[in-house]
């Protein structure tokens, strides 16, 4: 177990321990809640793993992070299944040591490897525990913790099985996405003189999109010179994808290829249509940004949660669903042309997206943390008076 410092020590009244890691879909909602409570005077500490994304992202946002040793709970083979209880027990002891050191008033689990042992350690330490599920189908860690948590909340309806008291609050989003919603008032107006397509594959990229979209764009450009594309490839894919596009498209500025997009809110504002996977954070961000989308869910996602995420907007006529098994040059090209040929449909999709968005999820979750800290403090005072 180790600690990486990103936030100076301050004598603050309350402390929140955030458990979130592995992917940006867990981490960034946690940061959004942390930022909200920090602004209210709370001290923030993080629990994660040293070999995952949170080890770099969390300190960059100014928060201390402690690491425990834990990997996925789902056994990939017999040996992994047999040793998992021992690894979980070790990580539980590590998490309890962190809790004794940090002394949090509230612990919140957002998903990721550290959430299960950290949440169990909070329960054993009698620290109020909140669980937040970002996906439309709850992950294993959150399903387990939901049975012992003081409060369970989620982004999408029916994320948990019946019998668990759940509050639907939406996904906490970065402030820049919330500001983007203010720009979305003019969603009836398309970008004059261009038809802008944003391709987003996540931090690792989506190989199927990297392969299909260059050929699709060739056909699109031959049908209409107004098409422009911004293609985010993911780590180590930029050179290969760039080479797949015609050089003339890049020279004329019709094609932009980048590994990462640092200002995703600006990218959403630029785009008329986004073609992407259906991670929970992406779905929630697109709703808030009022940007029509074509979702190509990751086919092997656990419990097919990406398809379920996508359906939240698809069923509201705010997005289109194109299963990866049906994705090819012809299918994606025809769908893009069909949408751009119906500007009113795009405008209606944008309006439907915005109506499905939740703008105050960070504030709602922060309020739950405040309420739990107050009620638990009152309980402790009553116990002290009885003694």
From Swiss-Prot:
Pathway(s) served: Cell wall biogenesis; peptidoglycan biosynthesis
> Catalytic activity annotated for this protein?
di-trans,octa-cis-undecaprenyl diphospho-N-acetyl-alpha-D-muramoyl-L-alanyl-D-glutamyl-meso-2,6-diaminopimeloyl-D-alanyl-D-alanine + UDP-N-acetyl-alpha-D-glucosamine = di-trans,octa-cis-undecaprenyl diphospho-[N-acetyl-alpha-D-glucosaminyl-(1->4)]-N-acetyl-alpha-D-muramoyl-L-alanyl-D-glutamyl-meso-2,6-diaminopimeloyl-D-alanyl-D-alanine + UDP + H(+)
Q: What is the recorded membrane topology of this protein?
A: Peripheral membrane protein
Name of the top EC class for this enzyme: transferase
Task: Kindly state which keywords UniProt assigns to this record, in alphabetical order.
Answer: Cell cycle, Cell division, Cell inner membrane, Cell membrane, Cell shape, Cell wall biogenesis/degradation, Glycosyltransferase, Membrane, Peptidoglycan synthesis, Transferase
Q: Which GO terms describe its biological process?
A: carbohydrate metabolic process; cell division; cell wall organization; lipid glycosylation; peptidoglycan biosynthetic process; regulation of cell shape
- SUPFAM superfamilies from the xrefs? UDP-Glycosyltransferase/glycogen phosphorylase
Q: Name one Pfam family in it.
A: Glyco_transf_28
CDD domains registered for this protein in UniProt: GT28_MurG
> InterPro entries this protein is in?
GlcNAc_MurG, Glyco_trans_28_C, GlycoTrans_28_N
* Gene Ontology cellular-component annotations: plasma membrane
Under Enzyme Commission nomenclature, its number is 2.4.1.227
Molecular-function GO term, any one = UDP-N-acetyl-D-glucosamine:N-acetylmuramoyl-L-alanyl-D-glutamyl-meso-2,6-diaminopimelyl-D-alanyl-D-alanine-diphosphoundecaprenol 4-beta-N-acetylglucosaminlytransferase activity
Q: Which residues bind UDP-N-acetyl-alpha-D-glucosamine?
A: 23-25, 135, 174, 203, 261, 280-285, 306
Where in the cell is the protein located? Cell inner membrane
Q: Which family does it belong to?
A: Belongs to the glycosyltransferase 28 family. MurG subfamily.
Q: Function, please? A: Cell wall formation. Catalyzes the transfer of a GlcNAc subunit on undecaprenyl-pyrophosphoryl-MurNAc-pentapeptide (lipid intermediate I) to form undecaprenyl-pyrophosphoryl-MurNAc-(pentapeptide)GlcNAc (lipid intermediate II).
Against NCBIfam families, the record matches this protein to: murG
Protein name per Swiss-Prot or TrEMBL: UDP-N-acetylglucosamine--N-acetylmuramyl-(pentapeptide) pyrophosphoryl-undecaprenol N-acetylglucosamine transferase
Q: Which organism is it from?
A: Colwellia psychrerythraea (strain 34H / ATCC BAA-681)
